[in-house]
């Protein structure tokens, strides 16, 4: 069910004007990890993609759980995590967030923390978890 909802949500947002930081996150994941964000991480394990529950399957999935928690903290501060966009640069392997206001800067920081974690955990990536059914979590 998680996979179908995520796919429906992604397709609905795939019109030319995709709101928020989703394009930034996709771009950041692909630049830092070299992997296709949607294909490789959109449905991975128990936490990558929208929502999450249970125990993370590996280091890669743990990164996504940490990212969910980071976003949860921003929601508690009334940041619009699904619609807020932000600017960043990727230079010499570093992600540099470029905002002065709280929500865009913190959203970018959550995403930066995720992509660095995913890069550190590339060795844990297991294709068996790429389209993992949520009911097994």
From Swiss-Prot:
CDD domains: PLA2c (cd00125). It catalyses: a 1,2-diacyl-sn-glycero-3-phosphocholine + H2O = a 1-acyl-sn-glycero-3-phosphocholine + a fatty acid + H(+); 1-hexadecanoyl-2-(9Z-octadecenoyl)-sn-glycero-3-phosphocholine + H2O = 1-hexadecanoyl-sn-glycero-3-phosphocholine + (9Z)-octadecenoate + H(+); 1-hexadecanoyl-2-(5Z,8Z,11Z,14Z-eicosatetraenoyl)-sn-glycero-3-phosphocholine + H2O = 1-hexadecanoyl-sn-glycero-3-phosphocholine + (5Z,8Z,11Z,14Z)-eicosatetraenoate + H(+); 1-hexadecanoyl-2-(9Z,12Z-octadecadienoyl)-sn-glycero-3-phosphoethanolamine + H2O = 1-hexadecanoyl-sn-glycero-3-phosphoethanolamine + (9Z,12Z)-octadecadienoate + H(+). It comes from the Eukaryota. Binds 1 Ca(2+) ion per subunit. This enzyme lacks one of the seven disulfide bonds found in similar PA2 proteins. Its cofactor is Ca(2+). Ca(2+) binds at residues 47, 49, 51, 68. GO terms for cellular component: cell surface; early phagosome; extracellular region; Golgi apparatus; phagolysosome; plasma membrane; recycling endosome. Disulfide bonds join 46-137, 48-64, 63-117, 70-110, 79-103, 97-108. Pathway: Lipid metabolism; phospholipid metabolism; Lipid metabolism; leukotriene B4 biosynthesis; Lipid metabolism; leukotriene C4 biosynthesis. PANTHER family: PHOSPHOLIPASE A2 FAMILY MEMBER, PHOSPHOLIPASE A2 GROUP V. Belongs to the phospholipase A2 family. Secretory calcium-dependent phospholipase A2 that primarily targets extracellular phospholipids. Hydrolyzes the ester bond of the fatty acyl group attached at sn-2 position of phospholipids (phospholipase A2 activity), preferentially releasing fatty acyl groups with a low degree of unsaturation such as oleoyl (C18:1) and linoleoyl (C18:2) groups. Hydrolyzes low-density lipoprotein (LDL) phospholipids releasing unsaturated fatty acids that drive macrophage polarization toward an M2 phenotype. May act in an autocrine and paracrine manner. This is Phospholipase A2 group V. It comes from Mus musculus (Mouse). The gene is Pla2g5.
């Amino acid at each position: 069910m998680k996979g179908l909802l995520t796919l429906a949500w992604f397709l609905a947002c795939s019109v030319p004007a995709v709101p928020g930081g989703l394009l930034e996150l996709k771009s950041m994941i692909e630049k830092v990890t070299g992997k296709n964000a949607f294909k490789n991480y959109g449905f991975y394990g128990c936490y990558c993609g929208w929502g999450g529950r249970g125990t993370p399957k590996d280091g890669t999935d743990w990164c996504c759980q940490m990212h969910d928690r980071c976003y949860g903290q921003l929601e508690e501060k009334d940041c619009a995590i699904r619609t807020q966009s932000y600017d960043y640069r990727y230079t010499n392997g570093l992600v540099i967030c470029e905002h002065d206001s709280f929500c865009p800067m913190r959203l970018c920081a959550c995403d930066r923390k995720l992509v660095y974690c995913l890069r550190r955990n590339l060795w844990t990536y297991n294709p068996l978890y790429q389209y993992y059914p949520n009911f097994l979590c």
